[in-house]
Every structure is written in C-alpha cells, then in structure tokens.
Amino acid sequence: MNAHTLVYSGVALACAAMLGSCASGAKEEAEKKAAEQRALLVESAHADRRLMEARIGAQESGADTQHPELFSQIQDVERQSTDAKIEGDLKKAAGVASEAADKYEILRNRVEVADLQSKIQTHQLAQYDGDSANAAEESWKKALELYETDSAQCLQSTVEALESYRKVAHEGFGRLLPDMKARAGAAKTDVGGLKVAVELRPQLEEADSQYQEAREAEEVNARAKAFSGYHRALEIYTELGKVVRLKKTEAEKALQSAKTKQKASSDLARSADKSAPLPENAQGFSKEPIEVEPLPNDRLNTTQADESAPIPISDTSSPSRVQSRGVEDGGRSPKSSMNEEGASR
C-alpha cells in the first residue's frame, strides 16, 4: 500500500467518523426536543386540570356572584391560555393557566376570609386569640398588595391569612359554644311544652334539623359550624314560641269576649225581668206542661176518623134490647101495634 492510499483511507475514516458524530448529535437533539415537548404537554395538562378545579371551587364558594368583576377578569386570563395553546405555545399556555388558577383560588379564599372576618367582628372573637388575629390581618394586607404583581405569592399570603383567621374563630367559638348550646336547648324544651299548630310544623322541623346538625358538628369539633347551628336553632325556637303564645293569647281573648257577651246578655234579661216581671205561670214561661190545641188539620183528621168507624149492629136476639127499642118508639110494644092495625081493618 503506497502513501497515497494510506492518506485517502485516513481521510475516509475521518469523514465517516464525523458523519457518524453528526448523525448521533442530531438524533440526541431530536430526542431532547421530543422529551421537552412531552414535558410541556404534561405540564399543560396539569395546569388545565388545576385551572378547572380552581374555577369550580370559586363558583361553589359563590365568588362569581359576590365578585363578578374580578371573576370576569380571571376568565379573560383563562382565555389567553386557550389562545396560546391554539397557537402551539404550550409553555405560555401552561404559565397563563397557572396564573388564572392562582387567581381563582385567591378569589375563593377571599370569600372565606370575608365570612370569617364578619363572624370574628360580630361575636368579638379577637379577644380570645389576639396573636392569631394580628397575624391574620398582616397576611391579608400583604395578599392584597401582591394581587396584581405576583399571583403565586398572593395566593400563599391568603392561605396564611386563612389559617390565622380559622384559629381565631376556633378558639373564640369554643369559648361561646357552651352558653349558646344551653340557650338553644332551653328554647327547644320550652317549645316542646307548647301545642304547636299544624301550619307551624315546618318551622319546628327546621329548628330541630338545625339543632341536630349543630350537635353533629360539635362531635367532630367543628366549633364554628356548631355555634352557627345552635344559634340558628335558638332563633327559630324563640320566634316559634312567640307565635304560639300569641295565638294562644288571641284564642283566650276571643273566649273571654264571648263569655263577657253572654254574661251581659244574661244580666240584661234579669234586669228586664225585675223591671217588668211576667205573671206567675205565664204561658211560655211556666215549668208546667202546656196544653196544645190541635191544628185545624188535626180536627179534620179526627172527624174523618170518627165517620169512617163502623156502626155497631143491634143484637135482636136479646129481649131486653127489643123491649128497650119498643119503649123508645113511644112505649108501644110490637104486639099492640099489630092489634091496632087489625082493628082498623
């Protein structure tokens, strides 16, 4: 093998090595891009699922009706994610979807925070856990400042605020619960001793249901829910007791009014009797039985009955009856009459 052949062989081997290296690099690059694409697809799917759950959670909390403008703004962000996905920019779509999900969860937390703030203020619960109350206020203030600039940090601050507010409510309602339970129980017993009308039964059933739910919540240490249930039951029982007693009072007044009118009528009759007394044993006012004359129709019926009665037939076989009949004819016997008739002949 000459020198030229060796040179050509070396060059060929080098080119082959270079070509193999390039092919290998291209394959690795393609595999890398495919892996990145799969990762983006997974990330996008995860973001979409979280976005859907966050939106449903916000709606179930009532955020869409309590804060319609903010909810509409988040829907606009959600549409941007959909547009990016249509354009094939999965990375942008996933990022925007995560931002929209953060804001939906922030809005949901905002509804719960507002509810806890109202309860804490109404029942003055901050006095039972001042440290947690202060921490809650600080975290919530920070969340409001971060809403427009950093949704992830804003969401974290709302979570911290919620945890602190819940501690305040849990401690405060725990202090107030025994008294509220006792009051609700007393009201329940009070109504149980009353006669509740049929039309008021639905209110009684609602109160009983609230009371039972409060007991169940107390058993699982859900103090806020238990307090709320007992409080609502107390309100219904109290109002129901007022209505039942009012109806009873009205019925008693009506009965007393009727008795008063009856007494007044009796007094008036006695007064009239004293001023113009009736004759003793006056007809219609005597205790003796009254003789009632028959009506004209009754007389007519009596006469017709007499006329229709059969006339008794004389018994001619009795001498006494014949003699008696002869006496009635002028004192002449049948024999003398016959003699007189013969003489005349």
From Swiss-Prot:
Membrane topology summary: Lipid-anchor
Organism superkingdom: Bacteria
Keyword vocabulary terms for this entry: Cell membrane, Lipoprotein, Membrane, Palmitate, Signal
UniProt-annotated location(s): Cell membrane
Lipid attachment residues per UniProt (S-diacylglycerol cysteine): 22
GO CC entries: plasma membrane
Coiled-coil annotated residue ranges, if any: none
Lipid attachment in record (N-palmitoyl cysteine): 22
Region Disordered, residue ranges: 256-345
Similarity field: To T.phagedenis TmpA.
The name this protein goes by in its record: Treponemal membrane protein A
Species, as recorded: Treponema pallidum (strain Nichols)
Gene name of this polypeptide: tmpA
